Amino acid sequence: MTSVLIVEDEESLADPLAFLLRKEGFEATVVGDGPSALAEFERSGADIVLLDLMLPGMSGTDVCKQLRARSSVPVIMVTARDSEIDKVVGLELGADDYVTKPYSARELIARIRAVLRRGADNDDAGADDGVLEAGPVRMDVERHVVSVNGEPITLPLKEFDLLEYLMRNSGRVLTRGQLIDRVWGADYVGDTKTLDVHVKRLRSKIEEDPANPVHLVTVRGLGYKLEG
């Protein structure tokens, strides 16, 4: 049974959500603060964590940092603040998705399933002798070969690295900061225009209509996402 750890100090939100999750076949555990969340995760683990950003005693961002330091468990950040900066911070800390209050419990459960499914798909892709697939794109990492709809394409090293990282996180929003750190390194001192140029070049090679991309899409104010 898939286990969900709900970290939420508002019982009026947490209890009905836990009830609905159990009806849908999940195992749900509710804790109301950050230290309890970390202790429960150490004790029992979880397949996915729903993490409120505003918690008493320890913020959700601090909890996320500590979770990421010890585990790759999927995290969905739940926040009452709808600002872009909060979403960017959550994603850069390693959250897999974010939901803004008030939310539909049914929508949240759908997002939980989507995040879990993406994780399973990415694990399967990574286990297949270094072969990744997303939409029409197929990448053989070890042989450094990429094809689109079965036709080989040529990618310079940085474009290859960028596409590989996007494919390993297919369906997940990646911020510009995450992409730059991964492909150019944390000590990169340029601006984000370099990333945008590389994205434009990738689109010209993997999209049927690069001006209206459907695979490598922009998530306004956040970054980019490669659709599977």
UniProtKB/Swiss-Prot annotation:
Highest rank taxon of the organism: Bacteria
The entry's keywords: Activator, DNA-binding, Phosphoprotein, Stress response, Transcription, Transcription regulation, Two-component regulatory system
One cellular component (GO) term of this entry: cytosol
SUPFAM superfamilies reported in the protein's UniProt record: C-terminal effector domain of the bipartite response regulators, CheY-like
Residue ranges the UniProt entry marks as DNA-binding: 129-228
Disruption phenotype: RegX3 cannot be deleted alone. However, the deletion of the senX3-regX3 operon is possible, possibly due to the accumulation of compensatory mutations. SenX3-regX3 deletion mutant is more sensitive to phosphate limitation, showing a reduced ability to grow at lower phosphate concentrations. The M.tuberculosis operon can functionally complement the growth phenotype in M.smegmatis under phosphate-replete conditions, but not under low phosphate conditions.
Biological processes annotated in GO: regulation of DNA-templated transcription
Domain Response regulatory: 3-116
Gene3D superfamilies per the UniProt record, alphabetical: 3.40.50.2300, 6.10.250.690, Winged helix-like DNA-binding domain superfamily/Winged helix DNA-binding domain (1.10.10.10)
Keyword Iron set for record: no
A molecular function (GO) term: phosphorelay response regulator activity
SMART domains: REC, Trans_reg_C
Expression induction: By phosphate-limiting growth conditions.
One Pfam short name: Trans_reg_C
Residue numbers bearing the 4-aspartylphosphate modification: 52
Post-translational modification: Phosphorylated by SenX3.
Annotated function: Member of the two-component regulatory system SenX3/RegX3 involved in stress response. The system is involved in phosphate starvation response. Once phosphorylated by SenX3, activates the expression of the alkaline phosphatase phoA, the high-affinity phosphate transporter pstSCAB, phnDCE, phnF and senX3. May act as a negative regulator of NhaA. Acts by binding to a DNA motif consisting of an inverted repeat.
Name the record gives this protein: Sensory transduction protein RegX3
Biological source species: Mycolicibacterium smegmatis (strain ATCC 700084 / mc(2)155) (Mycobacterium smegmatis)
Name of the coding gene: regX3
